[in-house]
Amino acid sequence: MKNVKNLKILSIFLAAFWILQSLTLPISATEETELSETSASEEAAPTDSAPEEQEETEETGAPETVSPPAEAPLGGDESSNFGVDAPRALAGPDELDLDAEALLLLELNSQTMVYAKNIDTRREPASLTKVMTCLLALEHGNLTDSITVSQEALDDLDPAGSSSGLMAGEVFTLEQLLYCLMIESANDAAPVIAEYVAGSEPAFVEMMNQKAAELGCTGTHFANTHGLHDEEHYTTARDLAKIMMAALEYEKFQEIYSADRYTLAATNLQEERILVTTNYLIDASITSDYYDERVIGGKTGFTTPAGRCVMCVAESGNLRYLCVVLGASSTGADGSTYFGSFVSASEALDFGFDSFTFAEVLSPLAPIAQLPVAHATQSVAVTPAESVTTRTD
């Protein structure tokens, strides 16, 4: 009977421990945040060699947005701030007003939704679309496969859009095309990849929408593989975060999205060339106005309807943030070229890194209890299976 009693006690203790482990300690929003508004840089990026993504030739006006469900209020207990589907964020526009139609800031290690602004509002994502294109290529393709560019893949592209200058009949590996897609934001690489994976771009777009549904994206509908303007092509900041998190599970994606240069070897039709990133958060060689040493990778986007867009990941100390910016300014106060998405991303990251830290409260290396064992001289040490952290302000 004593053995049974001890086993019951042990079972109850372990059950309580696992419940504790599945929870984090209460989190409360910072009541006062001392932040001064950062004035936007009005200096334009040099235009002599900048590989800026090109907007569509035809002006299409302001983006049409679909009214989302009412967003939940800020603050709340810890469970309401947890995960990419969190109904609440710790802060929003009242605490920090940023140049963006929508902005999401998620701390990845703790899965804490730190900042949210219109994250369920449907907007055009421009070339952030290409993260989904890259994800499906990594999921279904072989990086070393040879792919021949078809004329059909190039026929419907806007010649003024961002491009790697692919030629019909030119042969690349899938890996090379993914670098074109992500580094130079090449519109011409997207349909070529789509034809390789699915046989046609429409079939690939169907796969994109199926994958979005699989990832729990409830405000997304893709109409093309590159992100150029289409009334039926839209997503949300929250959905883009889900897509980015899925892509980050691939080491090759992390390698590609963090590269600022790539040497594209000579092909059967063209000489060797160097691909240069459109992401000035990770590359200061063209302009240092937007460089942020904390940012380790990301993807940019821009069309006139979508505005400046960026998704990036940044690290500092024990914090790792995913930031999604949609609909930021593209023109400075003096009318010059301006990258409001980069400025807003850095300001959001400043807020996240400066306002919060995380401390380990339970460690797999430190026992939390010693349980006696009946008819034995030694006790059993109980330790967490994983580290448990909580936020400290």
Placement of each model-derived feature along the sequence:
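Sec-dependent N-terminal signal peptides of Gram-positive bacterial secreted proteins and lipoproteins
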Residues: 4-28
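Active-site-adjacent loops and short helices of periplasmic peptidoglycan-processing enzymes
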Residues: 20-32, 37, 42, 48, ...
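Short, low-complexity interaction segments enriched in Ser/Thr/Pro/Gly
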Residues: 2-5, 49
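Domain-terminus/edge residues, biased toward the C-terminal soluble/receptor-binding domains
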Residues: 217-218, 232-234, 238-393
